A protein has these predicted regions:
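Extracellular glycan-recognition/adhesion modules and their associated mucin-like linkers
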Residues: 29-41, 110-118
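Acidic, glycine-rich flexible loop segments
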Residues: 93-131
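Positively charged n-region of N-terminal signal peptides that target proteins for export
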Residues: 1-4
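A low-complexity, Ser/Thr/Gly/Pro-enriched, surface-exposed linker/loop concept
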Residues: 19-26, 54-106, 138-146
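C-terminal or internal capping secondary-structure element at the end of a domain, subdomain, or sheet
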Residues: 123-146
Length: 146
């Protein structure tokens, strides 16, 4: 009976581990994280060495940007979202995007963590937030800052 209990416990532990979404963490100051959603619609980069810890994600939106283009923005607008370890999320006026073609794939219901932020894939969308609960939820069809 004792052996059966241990077998059942080990089987449960292994199956529970297999069902747990992968969580990765940036652990040192030189960590650079790049990832994309499984449908290749959203690309992100985070914790770039030498810059303030943050994650930036880009997607091609369908429709108008959620915020009007600032008058001083001469580059791309409405498709690049950013959130740092603290503070509010924002749209970024940028001439360059964080798209890294060979970045790791963040599968549905998986979460990746950086320095003070985390992102979770869900269906065709991605939600990224910081410790203060500020962030963004984006897909090609809808975008939201919170």
């Amino acid at each position: 009976m004792k052996n059966l209990f241990l077998f059942a416990l080990c089987t449960f532990s292994v199956s529970s581990f297999a069902l747990t979404p992968r969580i990765e963490t940036a652990s040192n100051s030189d960590s650079f994280i790049s990832f994309r959603t499984a449908n290749d619609a959203i690309y992100c980069s985070g914790d770039i060495p030498g810059l303030t810890p943050k994650v930036e994600c880009v997607t091609t939106i369908k429709g108008k940007p959620i915020l009007p283009r600032p008058k001083d923005c001469e580059f791309e607008w409405g498709e690049l979202f950013s959130v740092g370890a603290t503070g509010k999320a924002s749209l970024v006026c940028a001439s360059d995007t964080p798209a890294v073609p060979d970045s790791q794939i963040l599968k549905d219901d998986e979460t990746i963590k950086g320095k003070g932020w985390q992102c979770t894939a869900s269906g065709d969308s991605l939600t990224c937030s910081n410790q203060e609960k500020h962030g963004f939820k984006i897909s090609q069809a809808k975008q939201k800052l919170f």
